[in-house]
């Protein structure tokens, strides 16, 4: 009888531990930094984070369709605001970081006059994320439109479903250049040599990245802890190290 009770207790304990895992929908641009944030958060609270990455638009659609996420870290503010307006979140989103758009390549081709470079025969393929579902893709479209070359470069564009796919196109040489997030540079340290330039933030809408807790969560207390952590000075220090404005 004692043995049965012990086994039952262990099962309950294991279930409790498993129940601590927070499922966090994470914008693809955060795939590198979320590992560092999750490690730091676990050290502070003992709570395990299970990140599920994708484009912000696709993640928002999954949430509307009932995906079992607890928290959503978006690459913009509009997708979490939309979820709030439709009643999927516990409250309006907070901004946890500001993103920076870069043009980047594995080739040292010079970005002094990057718009002229994109029009030249030196560049055959340009990677951007789908502007409809990926905020950094939308920012790239805005910047290219502002420079007056969006229409002209259409035959060269290779579109990724998320910034992660764009980064793969860049690192594997599928694209000569691409538009990505500054956090890619930190992610690539010690792995891939990259040449890059920050795009003037005046030529695209500021990339405000928002966080929300989802009403569907069954772990409200832990979700609140993670929410507060992401807005804390410790998390901001990590995000800043990855090139985000805080």
Locations of regions flagged by a protein language model:
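Sec-dependent N-terminal signal peptides
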Residues: 4-15
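Exported/periplasmic ABC-transporter solute-binding proteins
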Residues: 20-44, 50-53, 57, 61-65, ...
């Amino acid at each position: 009888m004692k043995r049965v009770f012990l086994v039952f207790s262990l099962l309950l304990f294991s279930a409790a531990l498993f129940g601590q895992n927070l499922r966090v929908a994470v914008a693809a641009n955060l795939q590198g930094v979320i590992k560092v944030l999750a490690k730091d958060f676990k050290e502070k609270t003992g709570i395990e984070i299970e990140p599920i990455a994708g484009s912000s638009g696709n993640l928002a659609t999954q949430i509307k369709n009932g995906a079992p996420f607890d928290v959503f870290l978006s690459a913009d503010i509009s997708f979490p605001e939309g979820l709030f307006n439709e009643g999927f979140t516990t409250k309006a989103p907070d901004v946890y970081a500001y993103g920076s758009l870069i043009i980047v390549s594995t080739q040292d081709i010079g970005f002094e006059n990057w718009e002229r470079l994109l029009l030249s025969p030196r560049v055959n393929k340009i990677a951007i994320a789908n502007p409809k579902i990926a905020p950094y893709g939308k920012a790239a479209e805005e910047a290219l439109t502002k420079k007056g070359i969006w229409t002209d470069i259409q035959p060269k564009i290779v579109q990724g479903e998320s910034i992660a796919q764009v980064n793969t196109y860049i690192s594997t040489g599928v694209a000569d250049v691409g538009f990505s997030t500054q956090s890619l540079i930190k992610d690539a340290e010690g792995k891939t040599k990259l040449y890059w330039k920050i795009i003037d933030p005046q030529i695209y809408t500021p990339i405000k990245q928002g966080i929300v807790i989802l009403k569907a969560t069954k772990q409200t207390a832990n979700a609140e802890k993670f929410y507060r952590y992401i807005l804390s000075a410790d998390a901001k220090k990590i995000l800043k190290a990855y090139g985000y404005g805080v």
